[in-house]
């Protein structure tokens, strides 16, 4: 059976030689290599050793200067095949085998076609197609290798960057350690917070002092108003007292006039009594025997007693009237004073209530103003925070959109690379079929067989082996492959 192992050398690449082919042979990257034994598919060479094709020379397999598809140990040819067992092939279309000329068999002791002509089954277009496929495969592998190298480099740079950004890291490129600044930053933050708290305390004390000053000012104004009110009340009481003094003076003058009148009446009465007594003493007693007359003394005494009683009654009535009027006036004055005191106390209480209500109103207004200022500050801070959050949301959305775009691009690139990989796998499968000897186009659903031969000659000894490759193709796809040695 054919032995065509696919290897990769220690260099892990497929670099082209100076002649145009892939480097192989005795130590290069051997794509189809291995030391071919008797009847094997290949020889010592790989993907090219000294020519410009896939094999040695200009062929696909090639040996140490050979030119065949599998390559043997022949001389330097130039064909695509060059001989299954070696020889000196003669051109791309010169045969799949070797020998002295072209031909399909070549190495079976003259080749399948006798070694002098053979069947030209490959054309120049097929050679160019294979060369193009070879170039595309090499380009793809180079691109994959370059991408892997770039990816490794990017991973290394990302890792180094994360190592640099990690706190306390000390990389070889002189990364700085900022951990010592964190304590300073925290101390400064604490100082800023303490200063802010102290500033807030000072502002609060200032507001309290201003409110206290306003309260004292209001109290002073209220006390001043109360003082003016009390002074006005005192002036009113003074006027009332003056009126009462005038009334008292009038009453005293009336009392004096009444007393003088009483004294005058008494004096007149006494004078009349004295005059009557003198008249009675100096009269002449004339006695007549007549009817008894009334006693004048008794009459005068009766009159005097009547006048005295009348004077007493008048004096008592005047005193009673004076006392009653004085009592009424005193009661009225006392009631007025009591009402005035009650009114003053009620007014004072109302003023105190008004003052307390005004103070409470001022405090509530100040509290309302401070709360409004606090609310405005809180609304401003929250508006700023909301704007920052909205900016962060917009940035995150932009990053998400950018990442989505990058992901879509990477997905498209991945799909493209996957398609390229699929096409390359199909091309490699085509290469394998070509290596297996499937040189003719099989019919759909049927199996075909191709006879290949290999020959190796040493002196006069010739060994010939035949094998049959059977492939089952369904809808243009190879379903199964079978190799039968003849």
Curated annotation (Swiss-Prot):
Keywords: Coiled coil, Intermediate filament, Keratin. GO terms for molecular function: structural molecule activity. GO terms for cellular component: cytoskeleton; intermediate filament. Residues 1-125 are annotated as: Head. Residues 126-161 are annotated as: Coil 1A. Coiled coil: none annotated. Residues 300-438 are annotated as: Coil 2. Gene3D superfamilies: 1.20.5.170, Single helix bin (1.20.5.500), Vasodilator-stimulated phosphoprotein (1.20.5.1160). It comes from Xenopus laevis (African clawed frog). It comes from the Eukaryota. Heterotetramer of two type I and two type II keratins. There are two types of cytoskeletal and microfibrillar keratin: I (acidic; 40-55 kDa) and II (neutral to basic; 56-70 kDa). Residues 277-299 are annotated as: Linker 12. Residues 162-184 are annotated as: Linker 1. It holds the Pfam family Filament. Residues 439-486 are annotated as: Tail. InterPro entries: IF_conserved (IPR018039), IF_rod_dom (IPR039008), Keratin_I (IPR002957). The record marks 380 as: Stutter. GO terms for biological process: epithelial cell differentiation; intermediate filament organization. Residues 435-466 are annotated as: Disordered. Residues 126-442 form the IF rod domain. Residues 449-461 have a biased composition (Low complexity). Residues 185-276 are annotated as: Coil 1B. Belongs to the intermediate filament family. This is Keratin-3, type I cytoskeletal 51 kDa.
